[in-house]
């Protein structure tokens, strides 16, 4: 959980609190993305638990949150979601994402992910994965994130929706945004960087992603890399 998801447990109560909040986050979703195939089998026992506890929870295939897989569909309209919207981007690739915002019109050759009227604000969460961790438990960073996001919402950028990618904090902070800040949130996860044409090792052999790559794509800047990125699924996001 620490090297990949950035979640540090210092004692048993931290485990219990994390599981409690994670399950609560799922229970309050409007729509839950479920992975298929091998990804499903890895978490089958937990999926079975969710199905038993919340049988009426609406679900979709998690790939539905990744529009680059179905951009060529004649009914594609993902970009309409963001028309005239203020969008908060939560990502550890802060500096790279900010640079890529100006390239958004050129990143994808056919359809787009964001509407031309969309406004952005990029927030970098505490990055604890890839050897970047300190000695604080996950609860310390979670509370700090909540305070900072509330300040952004109230004082700086009254966002309409948050797109979230921040490891093991993602589901919990999405629920905080939705339930406490009363604002829409989509927990995209690691693939959020692809929305901005930021490539990572995980997708270098994916034909579905490679077909979109052009001169406006890039890899994360060195400033956005943790100390030992190879510790996180063999450098998957960098």
PLM regions and their residue ranges:
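Electropositive, gly/pro-rich neighborhoods at or near active sites that engage anionic ligands
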Residues: 1-117
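A short, acidic, amphipathic alpha-helical segment used as a generic capping/interface helix at domain edges
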Residues: 16-20, 141-155, 169-171
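Gly/Ser/Thr-rich loops at beta-strand to alpha-helix junctions
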Residues: 37-40, 92-97, 163-173, 192-193
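Glycine-rich phosphate-binding "P-loop"
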Residues: 55-64, 121-149
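Non-catalytic interface/targeting segments
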Residues: 81-128, 139, 209-238
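Short acidic/histidine-rich motifs immediately flanking catalytic phosphotransfer sites
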Residues: 157-160
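C-terminal functional extensions of proteins
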Residues: 169-238
């Amino acid at each position: 959980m620490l090297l990949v998801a950035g979640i540090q447990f210092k004692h048993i109560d931290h485990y219990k609190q994390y599981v409690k909040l994670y399950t609560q986050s799922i229970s309050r979703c409007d729509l839950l993305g479920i992975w298929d195939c091998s990804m499903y089998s890895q978490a089958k026992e937990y999926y079975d638990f969710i199905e038993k506890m919340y049988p009426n929870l609406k679900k979709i295939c998690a790939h539905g949150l990744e529009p680059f897989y179905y951009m060529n569909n004649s009914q594609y309209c993902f970009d309409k979601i963001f028309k005239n919207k203020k969008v908060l981007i939560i990502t550890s690739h802060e500096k790279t994402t900010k640079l890529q915002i100006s390239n958004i019109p050129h990143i994808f050759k056919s359809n787009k992910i964001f509407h031309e009227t969309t406004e952005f604000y990029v927030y970098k969460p505490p990055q604890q994965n890839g050897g970047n961790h300190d000695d604080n438990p996950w609860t310390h960073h979670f509370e700090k994130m909540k305070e900072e996001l509330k300040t952004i919402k109230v004082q700086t950028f009254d966002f309409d929706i948050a797109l979230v990618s921040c490891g093991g904090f993602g589901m919990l902070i999405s629920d905080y945004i939705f339930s406490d800040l009363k604002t829409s949130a989509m927990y995209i996860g690691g693939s959020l960087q692809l929305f901005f044409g930021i490539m990572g090792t995980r997708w270098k052999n994916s034909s579905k992603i490679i077909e979109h790559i052009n001169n406006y794509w890039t890899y994360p800047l060195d400033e956005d890399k943790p100390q030992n990125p190879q510790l996180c699924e063999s450098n998957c996001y960098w």
